[in-house]
């Protein structure tokens, strides 16, 4: 089994690491006081992170689950809050629609979720 990351995964890791350090780290104290990171999530949507595993046909980045885990790891290094938000958004909000939704539901919900315009939650 080859456990090395692909070039694409390494580039994505570096991008997420820079984003977390530059954009999330300065906001951590506010989040710890209860401020929800809406602007950060919108920026994550612009970067393709909110739809990292969603196919491009539905507005996502179309990346694999290894990339998704790398992204969560890099985000969580700076803020567990943001890492958990992405995890829940993807695993509870987006993936059930992607895997079990009708085509009509996919068309209606996946693009706004993938773009970070809607947030998936419990």
Give each language-model segment a name.
Residues 11-22:
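A non-catalytic, amphipathic alpha-helix used as a structural packing/dimerization or gating element
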Residues 24-122:
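Glycine-rich flavin
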Residues 1-8:
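Intrinsic disorder at enzyme termini
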């Amino acid at each position: 089994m080859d456990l090395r990351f692909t070039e694409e995964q390494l580039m994505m890791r570096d991008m997420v690491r820079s984003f977390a350090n530059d954009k999330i780290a300065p906001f951590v104290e506010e989040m710890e006081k209860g401020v929800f990171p809406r602007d950060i999530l919108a920026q994550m949507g612009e970067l393709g992170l909110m739809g990292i595993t969603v196919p491009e046909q539905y507005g996502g980045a179309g990346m694999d689950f290894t990339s998704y885990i790398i992204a969560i790891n890099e985000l969580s290094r700076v803020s567990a809050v943001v890492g958990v938000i992405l995890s829940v958004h993807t695993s509870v909000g987006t993936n059930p629609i992607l895997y079990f939704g009708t085509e009509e539901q996919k068309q209606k919900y996946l693009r706004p979720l993938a773009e970070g315009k809607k947030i998936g939650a419990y």
